[in-house]
Amino acid sequence: MEEIKVNDNTERMPMIGDPAPEFRAITTMGKVDFPADYKGSWVVLFSHPADFTPVCTTEFIGFSKMAEEFEEINTKLIGLSIDSLHSHLAWSRSIEDIDLDGNGTVKVKFPIIADISMAVAKKYGMLQTVAKTQTVRAVFIIDPDGYIRTILYYPMSTGRNLPEIKRIILALQKHDEDNVSTPANWQPGDNVVVGAPLTLQGAEERMASQDEDMVVYDWYLTLNCPTC
């Protein structure tokens, strides 16, 4: 059997719940010390394959249009690819001339990391193509304490669902504020999931509950109506 050789220099891919790997980098808005510079804010750190490419351009226009929406929920955006700073700047300027949907043009007002050395991309497991010469469409949602709460990867051919990224952040914030979970397709104002009881007695009490704010489907599935 052929022996498998392990490269000890390979970065361990971060996982949900891990502290966000630290780095210092040059961006289109100056130097950044991450995550220290963003303590107290949620962060969407996302990578794209390359500047001046069509799918990435639509994503950056979309992120730019939603930038204020993210700010309203205490969330900062940071882009990244292994292109140069000059490439990022030129691409950002060209984006300003594109009216994609007839609703006007936008400016890219969030920083884009110029990760030419691939140091940040390696720390975050963003290099997954065979040649490893492009970053994949990765998304890391990082909380105000600097912990990774969500990791998303998209195929090279598929643009990201930006409203879904915002929805995830809102769901995480709801969880942190009220210690509840959110069901499939949850939107702010919808019913939330109440934790299941951990004992037989608790299960029996849940089934017998007369709480008008709760909808009990079974002992393990209870929804709470936040607007009741």
Write out the residue ranges for each language-model feature.
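Chalcogenol-based redox active-site neighborhoods
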Residues: M1-C228
